[in-house]
Regions:
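Disulfide-rich extracellular domains of secreted proteins
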Residues: 16-130
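Sec-dependent N-terminal signal peptides
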Residues: 3-13
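Short, intrinsically disordered low-complexity segments
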Residues: 1-2, 72
Length: 130
């Protein structure tokens, strides 16, 4: 019985310790030219939060093939980290204010038209903070 009570109260204790999570998502972008960087919409908490980011999980979905040389970065206002897969986690934003928005930056190096265009269906993050 005590074990069950512990499980029930654990989320409340974590919240009391100042830990939390926020998530945000947006529709993606279409990148038609090489050598041009394009940003997603800002991904920000829907309500006021305070604390420092600890772990950030990301996910994005592409429509069509991944262009050779694609560089995808996840950025705060003060730092960026390259993301090498459509989903994953990073601690690169540890210490960044939890209320700071994040955004994806998309780029395919080179010059000229990108055929087919890079089409990002969606971008999403889950931000853990303390």
């Amino acid at each position: 019985m005590r074990r069950c009570l512990w499980i029930l109260f654990f989320p409340l204790m974590a919240q009391a310790a100042g830990e939390g999570t926020w998530q945000a998502s947006s529709i993606g972008v279409t990148l038609s030219n090489r050598g041009v960087a394009m940003s997603s919409r800002p991904l920000a908490p829907s309500e006021a939060v305070s604390g420092q980011m600890t772990l950030v999980a990301w996910n994005y979905r592409l429509i069509g093939p991944t262009p050779a040389g694609l560089i995808a970065r996840l950025c705060s206002q003060t730092r960026c980290t390259q993301v090498d897969a459509e989903s994953g986690t990073t601690q690169a934003f540890s210490g960044v204010s939890a209320d700071e928005p994040l955004r994806f930056i998309w780029e395919v190096p080179g010059g000229g038209r990108l055929i087919p265009a890079l089409k990002v269906q969606s971008n999403a993050v889950i931000v853990n903070y303390r």
